[in-house]
Amino acid sequence: MRIELRSHTENSPSGNPAENFQPYIDIFPVDGVSRPIGGVLILPGGGYIGRSYHEGDPIARRFNELGYHAFVLQYRVFPYTYPAPQRDLVRAVKLLRSMAGKLKLDKLAVLGFSAGAHLAASGTMLAEKFNEPEADFAESFSGKADAMILCYPVISLTDDFAHRGSGINLFGKNTPDEIIGQLNMQNLVDNTTPPTFIWHTANDAGVPVRNSTVFAENMWRAGKNCELHIFPDGPHGVGLGLGMDDVKQWPVLAGKFLHCSAGFTKA
């Protein structure tokens, strides 16, 4: 099942109709459930310029196996710029909440990879900023997820450990660091930040592991619920980590975190 986020398509900033994109959600339900269960809204990575398939549908199927509904959001990327992706995430959360009865959905987590994890954090932690210009039934629901799963996340866009390419693609190449740095997510942790599960590999050459450690440290400093796993070896973008005996355990660990630490119900 697929649902579009809006009844209309917002034109690409490039002015090229071929680059117009209507964001949508692919739905992967757990079949046969008799009561509402938790779900994960998956945000594939791609540096805010693409969306990686291996960080989408295969992740959804794995979380179905773990007893959770799953949803994959195909959000807008460059040439669309901030706040288009964040608006798409918040809209998706609201739409899914508005359909909770039909979907048998209880709590909802966002699960993002790399730049998709930056989107998960920014769209969740700043959800109230990204309302739709035209109100409808879905807009009456909260756009803030109940938990976050951040997989080898881009957290900073401008610090010495930042992934600068994501910031440039999100804001545009001529945007000053003072503007881009407003979405360095480690600086925005507060008492409303939801329970968060993070994992990374120590020698990730694409997005430095410090993105994860700094965010986790700020979560703990704020007294917030955060679980961090650093695996010793692995490249950036490993997705499910198949063929890696340690890394491939992360979905099980994340599923247990949702159930035991964030109060999610599973099938």
Annotate the PLM regions.
Residues R91-A162, I180:
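Primarily recognizes the serine-hydrolase "nucleophile elbow" in alpha/beta-hydrolase
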